[in-house]
Amino acid sequence: MFKRTRTLNRNTTATLLSPASGDLVSLSKVPDLLHARRVLGPGVAVAPEDGLFVAPLDGVVRTSPRTPHAYWIRSEDTLGGSPLEILVLVGTDSCRAQAPAVIPLVADGQRVTAGQPLCRADLEILEAQASSTLSPVVITVCPEGTAINLGTAHATAGSTPLARLTAT
C-alpha cells in the first residue's frame, strides 16, 4: 500500500487541490509527531474555515466507518501511469472526539472527482475534543523521483492548488 518506487515518465505533472478552505500550514505545525516528522510522507496541513472537505484529485476512496476522519484517495493515472495515494485527515486526533464530529458523504471504494465532497465536519466539536482542527494532507505514495511543490497560502476547497507534483 505504501510502496514508493515506480518509474515515471519525464515532464509529467499533477496538481492536488486543497480539500478544505483555509490557511495552508507546514506539517511541522501539526501537534502529532507522525505528521510533523513526515513519517507517512510529505504534505501540508489546512486550518479549515468551515467543515466541508472535498477530494483533492480524481480517484478511488478508501475509508472505514470506524475512522470517518481519514480518507485515502488512490489515483491510478496521475503521473505518467504511476499511482498516487493521498491521505486526507479531518483534524488531528479527531478519532478521540466522543460526539460524531465527521459525517462521511462518500463510501469506501467509491470513485470521486477532484472537488467532490468527501465529508462534513463539525469544527466546534473538533476544537473541543480533538488535539487540533489542523487537517493534514499527506502524499503517502508517489513515484520515485517526484518533485513536490507544496502551497503556502490561503486555499479554497476544490479550486486552490495544494501541491504540484513533477516528474524529474
What name fits each language-model region?
Residues 1-168:
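Contiguous, well-folded functional domains in the mature portion of proteins
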